[in-house]
Curated annotation (Swiss-Prot):
Disulfide bonds join 27-135, 48-85, 70-105. SUPFAM superfamilies: 4-helical cytokines. Residues 1-24 form the signal peptide. GO terms for cellular component: extracellular space. This is Interleukin-4. Pfam families: IL4.
Length: 135
């Protein structure tokens, strides 16, 4: 019995340390996948890259990063659902981005300036690389 009481604190410590490692590692893997997809997408010579999208980065200054990622996901979904191009990559990017985004947000296209899909992806790539460097 004495050995069991000595093992409990060690096991708890091991469990806590492991959970911190896994959490940080998950962040790295998700960001790595997003950056990899963005690199592939931005190197594409595809007419879809010039499609107009809402400038999700022109949001109010008090918008959170999660809200911005949510709006980016909405625009990506709009492109790959309405246009038959880059579906595999845009769908994968949308799935990975949703893990970093808030669950609900809105894109008011009437008041939002427009950009191209290429510009959206390039800005997103810059943000993700900065985020990865801090992770």
């Amino acid at each position: 019995m004495g050995l069991t009481s000595q093992l409990i604190p060690a096991l708890v410590c091991l469990l806590v340390c492991t959970s911190h490692f896994v959490h940080g590692h998950k962040c790295d893997i998700t960001l790595e996948e997003i950056i990899k997809m963005l690199n592939i997408l931005t190197s594409q010579k595809n007419s879809c890259m010039e499609l107009p999208v809402a400038d999700v980065f022109a949001a109010p200054k008090n918008a959170t990063e999660k809200e911005t990622f949510c709006r980016a996901g909405i625009e990506l979904r709009r492109i790959y659902r309405n246009h038959m191009c880059l579906n595999k990559f845009l769908g994968g990017l949308d799935r990975n981005l949703s893990s970093l985004a808030s669950k609900t947000c809105s894109v008011n296209e009437a008041k939002t300036s427009t950009s191209t899909l290429r510009d959206l992806l390039e800005r997103l790539k810059t943000i993700m690389k900065e985020k990865y460097s801090k992770c």
